Amino acid sequence: MDMESKKPYLMVTIIQVIYTIMFLISKAVFNGGMNTFVFVFYRQAFATIFLAPLAFFFERKSAPPLSFVTFIKIFMLSLFGVTLSLDLNGIALSYTSATLAAATTASLPAITFFLALLFGMERLKVKSIQGTAKLVGITVCMGGVIILAIYKGPLLKLPLCPHFYHGQEHPHRNNPGHVSGGSTSWLKGCVLMITSNILWGLWLVLQGRVLKVYPSKLYFTTLHCLLSSIQSFVIAIALERDISAWKLGWNLRLVAVIYCGFIVTGVAYYLQSWVIEKRGPVFLSMFTPLSLLFTLLSSAILLCEIISLGSIVGGLLLIIGLYCVLWGKSREEKNSGDDKIDLQKENDVVCNEVKVVIS
């Protein structure tokens, strides 16, 4: 495997590290009382400020003209795949935990795969070993997500956070993210998180089609952020009229907004567009379980969130499912390449025979 073919793997790993930090820092500011709708507006606005100059200087001359139909498509993608997805994700994260956010995001492989099948961007040959591997992988991923959502089991004792155990209460006991797995708040958060990821999966699948008619990735991402910032502002101002909730000080809130705006919405979204163009939406979503592993350990150390047996078992199932699907896709791509080579050889033989007959 040469360096060029390794780039998509490197990019998706970087994307998952970026998202891990996002889960942690977002949960921290929500624990501190920041309004989730205001947070989404600020992160999208900062992303627009960051990307607009880059798009102007680097793609001003190469960007194709934007038709009205394409603009409407991008507007709807921004509304459902970015604005509403982020708003629902923010609410769900305030109800649950950073680990659950990463875990339910790992359901993206199943969501994206079925949506890609629906839109004809993926195929599934159940009778082939590749198709069976992909189907088994998706099923295992879904099983892992279900276990993470409904089963906790024994707690893993970490010496860094001893107050979890021996009957002592967690200092954030009033935070919905630390309530028992059977509580209404926890289940509500799970439902909202899954809905958010369904919208996100739809965004991943459909933006591939839009990029074919508007291939300027930087302009595309900038327009996404601009439209989303306008949409999220309308939602936030309608639901939060308290001026104090909109103030940003020199604290973690400002750091979170800048990071999520510049790095997540700006850099990660651009990298996602690049990976989707090179390898497709399902390849990108297959690496989301990596952020679960990173978040599981980081949240336990930095946010003192509970690591349970259910989290470990669910995470292992997600990783197993990930590599089942990746193996199936790699075999499928290899066979497709071999078929093209065989077809070319057959064409060459036919051409040579025709030349002999003519001569």
Swiss-Prot record:
SUPFAM superfamilies: Multidrug resistance efflux transporter EmrE. Keywords: Membrane, Repeat, Transmembrane, Transmembrane helix. It is found in: Membrane. One of its GO terms (molecular function) is transmembrane transporter activity. It comes from the Eukaryota. The chain crosses the membrane at residues 10-30, 37-57, 66-86, 100-120, 135-155, 186-206, 218-238, 256-276, 282-302, 306-326. Its main location: membrane. Belongs to the drug/metabolite transporter (DMT) superfamily. Plant drug/metabolite exporter (P-DME) (TC 2.A.7.4) family. It comes from Arabidopsis thaliana. Pfam families: EamA. Residues 18-136, 198-326 form the EamA domain. This is WAT1-related protein At5g64700. GO terms for cellular component: membrane. It is a multi-pass membrane protein.
